[in-house]
Amino acid sequence: MKRNFWLLIIIVVLSCSRRDKLHDRIMKEQEMISFLVELHTIQSQVQNLRLPADSSEILFIVLEKDLLSKMNVRDSTFYESFSWYLDHTDMMYDIYSAVVDSLSLRNSLVRKVEE
């Protein structure tokens, strides 16, 4: 019984430290917001080209890799961060609220310039 108790304690401690390490590896909220704003902008630009689906997908992947490189983010870091924020829905809601606000502001500025 004592052995099982200590084994349980060790598992709990290791899982907590693993979670903390994961949290240290994820992108900060502001980094995530900036990245997602740019990513959605790229996605919109690719869709507006009206290319065949396979060509659009290839172009999007290339542009996404360029964005990752430009922002100095590894793809695994982005995907891990995105997954982490999906598990923390209140934070993801705040992130996407900021993304939508930023994209709306960009859109209104572009419309003003076009007028």
Whereabouts are the PLM-identified features?
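Short functional linear motifs
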Residues: 6, 32-33, 78
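Bacterial signal peptide processing site
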Residues: 17-19
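C-terminal motif of bacterial Sec signal peptides marking the signal peptidase cleavage site
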Residues: 13-15
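Sec-dependent signal peptide recognition
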Residues: 2-9
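Short hydrophobic/aromatic-rich motifs at helix boundaries and adjacent loops
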Residues: 4, 35-39, 51
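Compact alpha-helical subdomains of small soluble proteins
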Residues: 50-115
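Post-signal peptide N-terminal segment of mature Sec-exported envelope proteins
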Residues: 25-46
